[in-house]
Amino acid sequence: MQFFVYSAVAAGFGIAIAAFGCGIGQGMAVRGAVEGIARNPEASGKVTVTMLIGLAMIESLSIYALVVSLILIYANPVSTAMQGFVGLGK
């Protein structure tokens, strides 16, 4: 039973760390884009497109962390093996 509690806690910490890291990364990316547009307003179109592609890549990392967390909680492939290992299996 403790294994499932640890899985839920690990999933929570994993998504929290991923969200924190992605938020910091997105903030730094937007800051850099705004500074670049402030220095060269004519390049705002290219900078904006590049920034949006970068933000999508950063956000994909957060989505991957969410998928891994959901797998840890709901579809853990080693749950039956771990139940047998800790003595909860039949």
From Swiss-Prot:
Please give the superkingdom of this protein's source.
Answer: Bacteria
Q: Which GO terms describe its molecular function?
A: lipid binding; proton-transporting ATP synthase activity, rotational mechanism
Instruction: Give residue numbers for the site Reversibly protonated during proton transport.
Output: E59
Which InterPro entries does the record associate with it?
ATP_synth_csu_bac/chlpt, ATP_synth_F0_csu, ATP_synth_F0_csu_DDCD_BS, ATPase_proteolipid_c-like_dom, F/V-ATP_Csub_sf
Predominant location of this chain?
A: membrane
Q: Which Gene3D superfamilies match?
A: lithium bound rotor ring of v- atpase
Its cellular-component GO annotations read:
plasma membrane; proton-transporting ATP synthase complex; proton-transporting two-sector ATPase complex, proton-transporting domain
Q: How does it sit in the membrane?
A: Multi-pass membrane protein
* Annotated TM spans: 4-24, 53-73
What keywords does the record list, in alphabetical order?
A: ATP synthesis, Cell inner membrane, Cell membrane, CF(0), Hydrogen ion transport, Ion transport, Lipid-binding, Membrane, Transmembrane, Transmembrane helix, Transport
Any idea where this protein resides? Cell inner membrane
Return the PROSITE patterns for the record. Answer: ATPASE_C
> Which purpose does this protein serve, as stated in its record?
F(1)F(0) ATP synthase produces ATP from ADP in the presence of a proton or sodium gradient. F-type ATPases consist of two structural domains, F(1) containing the extramembraneous catalytic core and F(0) containing the membrane proton channel, linked together by a central stalk and a peripheral stalk. During catalysis, ATP synthesis in the catalytic domain of F(1) is coupled via a rotary mechanism of the central stalk subunits to proton translocation. Key component of the F(0) channel; it plays a direct role in translocation across the membrane. A homomeric c-ring of between 10-14 subunits forms the central stalk rotor element with the F(1) delta and epsilon subunits.
Subunit record text: F-type ATPases have 2 components, F(1) - the catalytic core - and F(0) - the membrane proton channel. F(1) has five subunits: alpha(3), beta(3), gamma(1), delta(1), epsilon(1). F(0) has three main subunits: a(1), b(2) and c(10-14). The alpha and beta chains form an alternating ring which encloses part of the gamma chain. F(1) is attached to F(0) by a central stalk formed by the gamma and epsilon chains, while a peripheral stalk is formed by the delta and b chains.
Q: Which NCBIfam families match?
A: ATP_synt_c
Protein family membership: Belongs to the ATPase C chain family.
Q: What is this protein's record name?
A: ATP synthase subunit c
What gene is this protein a product of? atpE
